[in-house]
Amino acid sequence: MIMAEKTENSTGRRPETDEITMSHVRDMSLAESGRMKIRWVQDFMPALVAIRARFEREKPFAGKKITISIHMEAKTAFLALCLAAGGAEVHATGCNPLSTQDDVAAGLASMGVETYAM
């Protein structure tokens, strides 16, 4: 049995308000690596970029709270950002510790999405 290393609860900040989020991720020092992976998705997945642009214009989720339990990796993190761009208050949690990428979780938290991925 593999035991998880001791972790620290870390916080991110919402970029638009500098408000502290309640995110809990394994290691916030990995955030830059996670943001790089999420930016890769933005560069190479034009369909999601188009969806985000539409959501930014129309704000279909304004005033809504959306919680997603997902395999925490770059493509699904970008999906969470798309929902946030649509006006939603997004909370994301990893659904499987074996598929959760700690750097992506930290990157997502640093980009203002409440992220729970220990």
Residue ranges of predicted features:
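Metallocofactor- and cofactor-centric catalytic cores in central/energy metabolism, strongly enriched
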Residues: 4-118
